[in-house]
């Protein structure tokens, strides 16, 4: 057994000797050095490409946001590209070009061409989009990322470096579906409250313009005494098709996600709820929104079929709403935070309502899809 152990130890020592010989041969031939040079220099290229991509993404989203908000300033691309560059290039990056389409106009150098191999294909005609391409730039103005070791290898004496490129594409526009709260407002009331999309109030915490004091949107008014809408009559138990109703609550959290809207016959639809009692989860959502002055996003319907839990709403678009008060009976009511009055009176009448005002803004991209009617809300998404 002792001889066996000795032989095994001797074998291990012999293996180490063999490995040492192989390493010496490879080093003598420059193979290991070449491999190390390749790893270091390729790693630099990957790092530069990642930084350029981050800069292009950030710039595309920032420009898209500025365009959605009305200013459309492509010149901000450079600051975002530089902010994502590291010491590898001296904290700088080059914006090769900015192009795109904004409604009837263009962004940057104009509509993007179709032959840029670094960028995604152009979106369909009629889409608002911007493309930002970034590339290597050093603090000294050079556009070549110099190698660390590669130039020392045989045959590479003239190699000066490489230029790395990255491209990003962002789109913006009205969302067709998205994540919303579990209430729905009518297109008629949206049209009246915003003068057909021409007048919006300031977003909280700023008070709205005096001309845009909170509107009261009735949900249930069997006496007709509180109705001040010019919208046509609607489902049983509701004042008008232009007013407010509960949606179905498939997630039991007073929310609808993009997947809760059904696309049929060229339109999106979603289910309704009787609303005989205010759902407890909606009491929490609406209470928090009113207390914290949080903007809520609501589906706006253009038409409906059926009644109560069998009602189906046809989606017109998504809107942003600042909830300032509500009255669903003595168990769930709060005075409007601007007027100080309980909306839709009370005084024993069987009337329920919400109060607030419509806003312009950006809806979170999660769960949202582009292509809807513009009701003051837009979404921005990276698409390439």
Language-model region placement:
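Alpha-helical assembly-interface signal, strongest on the long, hydrophobic N-terminal helix that forms
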Residues: 1-82
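N-linked glycosylation sequons
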Residues: 71-78, 82, 91-384
């Amino acid at each position: 057994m002792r001889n066996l152990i000795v032989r095994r130890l001797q074998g291990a020592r012999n293996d180490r000797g063999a490995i040492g010989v192989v390493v010496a041969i490879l080093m003598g031939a420059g193979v290991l050095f070449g491999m190390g040079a390749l790893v270091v220099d390729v790693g630099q290229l990957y790092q530069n490409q990642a930084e350029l991509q981050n800069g292009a993404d950030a710039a595309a989203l920032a420009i898209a946001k500025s365009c959605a908000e009305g200013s459309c300033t492509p010149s901000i691309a450079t600051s975002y590209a530089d902010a994502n560059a590291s010491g590898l290039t001296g904290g700088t990056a080059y914006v090769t070009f900015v192009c795109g389409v904004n409604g009837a106009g263009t962004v940057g150098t104009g509509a993007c061409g179709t032959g840029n191999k670094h960028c995604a294909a152009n979106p369909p005609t009629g889409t608002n989009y911007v493309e930002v391409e970034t590339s290597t730039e050093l603090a000294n103005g050079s556009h070549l990322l110099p190698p660390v070791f590669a130039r020392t290898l045989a045959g590479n004496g003239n190699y000066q470096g490489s230029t790395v490129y990255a491209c990003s594409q962002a789109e913006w526009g009205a969302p067709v579906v998205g994540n919303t709260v579990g209430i729905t407002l009518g297109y008629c009331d949206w049209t009246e409250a915003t003068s057909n999309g021409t007048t919006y109030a300031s977003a909280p915490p700023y008070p709205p313009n005096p001309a845009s004091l909170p509107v009261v949107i009735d949900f249930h008014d069997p006496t007709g005494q509180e109705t001040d809408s010019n919208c046509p009559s609607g489902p049983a138990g509701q004042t008008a098709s232009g007013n407010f109703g509960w949606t179905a609550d498939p997630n039991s959290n007073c929310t609808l996600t993009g997947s809760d809207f059904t696309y049929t016959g060229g339109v999106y639809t979603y289910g309704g709820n009787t609303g005989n009692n205010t759902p407890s989860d909606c009491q929490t959502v609406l209470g928090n929104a009113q207390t914290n002055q949080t903007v809520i996003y609501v589906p706006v319907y253009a038409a409906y079929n059926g009644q109560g839990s069998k009602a189906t709403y046809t989606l017109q678009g998504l809107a942003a709403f600042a909830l300032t008060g509500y009255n669903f009976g003595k168990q769930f009511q709060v005075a409007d935070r601007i007027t100080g009055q309980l909306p839709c009176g009370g005084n024993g009448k069987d009337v329920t309502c919400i109060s607030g005002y419509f806003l312009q803004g950006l809806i979170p991209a999660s769960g949202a899809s582009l292509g809807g009617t513009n009701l003051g809300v837009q979404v921005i998404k990276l698409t390439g």
